[in-house]
């Protein structure tokens, strides 16, 4: 199962990021001390006309923002001309190992399509030895930089991996590339772009953990979803010593999600029959598709399906084109409660041509004491 994650730190994302603007002041009221927190929320937005073409040169006055139905004041704004940050995560495992050069060329094409001033970080999956065992891990090959020569040289260093730590890779990106939890600054246009089939094979973390961390980061997520199922299933059948197989973690996840009450749970791949292998494959691919759609929608990103890596470069061009037309605005929420509740975001347009449409993140979870 292969996976290329392009982390595209894109300010204009259609995502909403809850950020702590400054350390909350303490206000003393007689015998009670009340903590007030001022939070900056980032909202990446894509705006198109009725024909689907991007609407450029919009101003803060063209946007109305509501949180849980209450109007908010736009305090920060990034236009489509301001630079963004991109982290490129490449996973060359499983069915894509033989296409390493194709992956490298597609990634190089994506980098070349970015504008001057846009910064990129390259993160890759690789095979490492831990406690005497060969495992797949993620590795930050370059920090954020606009040095195109350095980035292209780094692409030549990308190697193959014996697994897909998909969730671990996303968490690593949030922490090591984006700097972990939101800080007190308006971060602008950021995004994650992932070229992957989305099927995790070796992560220690799970989807819910990733979803929560991405939501807190406010980074939009884009997927170039490569269909590897047919190839993978062909390699699954027959001799259990085949080059492709389910990891123990995948098999356990399959039973936990789809058959939680089953008493017969086989974790040894070699003890699975062909019918069971195909059922696991079908279920995990469907789950991966659902998770990608969820992450993209919640963050204001998008999924771009492709049937093979040969189509990846054109899909990257589409992603880059959309990222280049994103806006990002920020507001200080009038709801200062630290209750961990989910806050719904609604953005409306005014003073734009009839039929204009927008896509933005639909909400965020507030901090909790």
Q: Residues of each region from the PLM?
A:
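Bacterial N-terminal signal peptides
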Residues: 2-14
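Scaffold/interface architecture of coatomer-like assemblies
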Residues: 17-369
């Amino acid at each position: 199962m292969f996976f290329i994650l392009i982390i595209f730190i894109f300010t204009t994302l259609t995502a909403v990021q809850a950020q702590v603007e400054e350390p909350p002041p303490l206000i003393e009221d007689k015998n009670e001390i009340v903590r007030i927190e001022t939070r900056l929320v980032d909202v990446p937005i894509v705006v198109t006309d009725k024909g689907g073409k991007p609407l450029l040169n919009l101003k803060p006055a063209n946007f109305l923002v509501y949180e849980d139905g209450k109007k908010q004041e736009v305090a920060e704004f990034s236009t489509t001309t301001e630079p963004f940050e991109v982290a490129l995560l490449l996973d060359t495992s499983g069915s894509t190992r033989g296409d390493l050069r194709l992956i490298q060329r597609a990634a190089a094409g994506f980098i070349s399509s970015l504008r001057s001033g846009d910064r990129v970080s390259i993160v890759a999956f690789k095979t490492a030895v831990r406690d005497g065992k060969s495992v797949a891990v993620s590795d930050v090959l370059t920090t954020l930089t606009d040095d195109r020569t350095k980035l292209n040289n780094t692409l030549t260093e990308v190697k193959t991996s014996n697994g897909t730590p998909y969730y671990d890779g996303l968490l690593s990106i949030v922490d090591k590339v984006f700097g972990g939890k939101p800080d007190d600054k308006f971060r602008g246009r950021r995004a994650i772009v992932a070229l992957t089939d989305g099927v995790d094979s070796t992560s220690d973390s799970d989807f819910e953990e990733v979803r929560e961390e991405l939501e807190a980061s406010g980074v939009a997520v884009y997927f170039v979803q490569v269909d590897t199922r047919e190839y993978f299933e062909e390699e699954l059948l027959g001799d259990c010593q085949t080059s492709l197989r389910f990891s123990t973690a995948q098999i356990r996840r399959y039973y936990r999600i789809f058959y939680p009450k089953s008493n017969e749970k086989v974790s040894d791949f070699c003890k699975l029959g062909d019918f069971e292998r195909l059922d696991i494959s079908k279920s995990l691919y469907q789950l991966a598709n659902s998770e990608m759609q969820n992450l993209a929608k919640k963050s204001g990103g998008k999924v771009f399906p492709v049937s093979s890596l040969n189509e990846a470069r054109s899909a990257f061009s589409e992603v880059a084109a959309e990222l280049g037309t994103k806006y990002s605005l920020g507001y200080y929420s009038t709801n200062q409660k630290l209750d961990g509740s989910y806050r719904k975001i609604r953005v409306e347009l005014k003073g734009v041509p009839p039929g204009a449409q927008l896509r933005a993140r639909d909400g965020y979870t507030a901090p909790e004491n």
